[in-house]
A protein has these predicted regions:
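Conserved donor nucleotide-binding strand/loop of the catalytic core
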Residues: 1-27
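Catalytic-site signature of metal-activated, phosphate-bearing donor transferases
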Residues: 19-25, 32, 43-204, 210-211
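Aromatic, loop-rich ligand-recognition surfaces of beta-strand-rich domains
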Residues: 40
Length: 211
């Protein structure tokens, strides 16, 4: 498919989420970068909006709304989408060094743009739990290096706040059980991140990828 559309295909050993994407950015030959993962795609309306904007760009980077697949359904129209910086000038942006959740950073003006893209998340609860278990383990050493303050308080409060942010703040309650599952697993992810960090501080031998 890529070759049919005159796209160049490059491969390299996996070097981590951020470095891998940065390598792809450096290989790109255009002025603008649209950063999408393999399980994401731009909607037709989003594509048209981007083309109109780039005809006379007002910024160096744009945050796009991401529509999340919630186990067995797309979100209700009233659900508030997360906005992520995904469109930017190549000369002004690069990936940060955060493991697992590496994201682009842009020097210059950044605006919101109503150009939605869709993310096909995990289709089953078990897949989601496996993923957040891996990701939370991958963040342990990074967070230990940052010397997170008030760890015990974060462990107690952040899971509840993560649930409320999605279920109430982002209106996931409009999505029935799928929205409830998504909010609860996000709360569990918040718990795992800080629980594993506390565990690693008490038993450094248990902070590896299999934790």
């Amino acid at each position: 498919i890529a070759r049919r559309h005159d796209a160049r295909i490059e491969t390299q050993p996996f070097a981590g989420y951020g470095p891998q994407k940065q390598a792809a950015i450096e290989l790109a030959v255009g002025e603008w970068i649209l950063l999408l993962d393999a399980d994401e795609h731009l909607t037709e309306g989003g594509r048209a909006t981007i083309l109109r904007e780039l005809a006379a760009p007002r910024a160096d980077g744009y945050r796009l709304p991401r529509q999340e697949w919630l186990f067995w359904r797309w979100p209700h129209a009233g659900t508030r989408a997360n906005r992520q910086l995904r469109l930017f000038r190549k000369a002004r942006g690069r990936m940060n060094k955060v493991p697992v959740h590496a994201a682009p950073e842009v020097e210059g003006r950044v605006l919101d743009l109503a150009a939605p893209f869709r993310h096909y998340g995990e289709p089953r609860l078990a897949d989601r739990v496996d993923k957040i278990n891996r990701y939370s383990s991958g963040l342990v050493e990074y967070k230990r290096g940052k010397r997170v303050r008030f760890l015990a308080l974060r462990l107690l409060l952040y899971p509840m706040l993560a649930f409320l942010k999605l279920y109430v703040g982002k209106r996931y309650f409009l999505n029935g059980w799928a929205g409830f599952f998504a909010a609860k697993t996000q709360a569990f992810y918040a718990f795992l991140k800080y629980a594993k960090l506390l565990e690693a501080g008490r038993d450094p031998n248990r902070s590896g990828p299999g934790a």
